[in-house]
Amino acid sequence: MSEDTFITQEGRLKGVPSSPLYSSSFHPSPYWDERPQLTKSGAAGDPVDLIVLHFISLPAGTFGGDAVDRLFMGTLDPDRRDWPQDPAWEPLKTLKGLHVSTHFFIRRNGEVIQYVPTVKRAWHAGLSNFRGRNACNDFSVGIELEGTGEVPFTAVQYQALGELLPAICRRHPVKWVTGHKFIAPGRKSDPGPFFDWGRTAQLLPAGVALAIDETDCDREALARRMAEHSN
């Protein structure tokens, strides 16, 4: 695998035929902005030192459709008449006007889709805190895995994650990998109880550690930030 082409200087992923990511693709999302550290200091400093893992399925428990892809690309229409007339699809209407994104999405079949270059800020973590720092979007890369908190993830998803995590760590000075639930406790639960953290630990390059303890979030600082946000 070529280190200089797998993730480019601009933070774009390129698939390699010999890897599970041969089916990788880039679907540009409109939902991103500049990382504030880079805006202030230019390209001289790279603040990205955290990877945040999530799960997602739309509707909940439905895999393989295009709803997640459309959500991140800003083309999700909750009023589409060609979607199933099923109560399970009704919650999608609450997503109307929601602007969210992620850097990467790993489908159940191992396919990897990138939406935002890693040098840019994707909108995946929301109100969050990691070890005293609020706004984790500022300094993290987000990876969404297609799944729920009720079923295990697939072997090929871990295989793809095993390719993707080291590639990101080569491009950015990543120190930690965490889950959304650990930076937004009480508000989020992903990547859920079926995510295999032990297996993930074996995928990490030297110098990168898991941060999966409740103390990794400064709850008081996060509560203050949430109170400010609600005013």
Describe the predicted segments one by one.
Residues 2-24, 44, 134-139, 148-231:
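Basic/polar, cationic surfaces and motifs that engage anionic cell-wall
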Residues 1-134:
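N-terminal catalytic cores of peptidoglycan-degrading enzymes
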